[in-house]
């Protein structure tokens, strides 16, 4: 009887425990878009490999591996449907990283011009409204520092 109860519980947990209902849409997805060619070429598998200012976009602790006094990066990607994604990052390592590495980043997305619509009781089910131009912008300040040869910390305020 005990095994039977376990099997019933196991079956119910498989059936109902994996339910994944999408209740809403997520925002700020532009923050997760690859911002540089090196990351894009490696399918974003860059979490532990950063040593430039671009680490601000995925792992700010990577700033601590920077060997130059400063680093600047600018990238611009034109996507389908007229979407334009621009990124800028700058990092500075005063005193050869003795005090850590400071960084600054900008992200901008221009989604182009879109036609607005509204639900309406007609044969199409909608009417056209005016056109609009959505965009998104993020700015961040970051810091990274090595605590040992194999351990670094970092963070960013956006």
Language-model features, listed with the residues they occupy:
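Hydrophobic h-region of N-terminal signal peptides that target proteins for export
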Residues: 10-17
């Amino acid at each position: 009887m005990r095994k039977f109860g376990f099997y019933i519980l196991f079956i119910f947990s498989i059936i109902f425990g994996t339910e994944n209902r999408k209740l809403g849409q997520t925002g700020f997805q532009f923050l997760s878009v690859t911002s540089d060619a090196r990351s894009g070429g490696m399918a974003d598998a860059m979490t532990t490999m950063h040593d430039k200012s671009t680490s601000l976009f995925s792992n700010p602790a990577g700033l601590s591996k920077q060997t130059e006094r400063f680093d600047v990066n600018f990238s611009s990607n034109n996507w389908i449907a007229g979407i334009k994604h621009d990124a800028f990052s700058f990092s500075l390592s005063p005193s050869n990283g003795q005090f850590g590495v400071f960084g600054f980043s900008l992200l901008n997305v221009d989604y182009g011009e879109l036609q607005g619509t509204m639900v309406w009781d007609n044969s199409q089910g909608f009417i056209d409204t005016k056109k609009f131009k959505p965009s998104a912008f993020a700015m961040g300040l970051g810091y990274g520092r090595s605590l040992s040869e194999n351990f670094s910390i970092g963070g960013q305020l956006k």
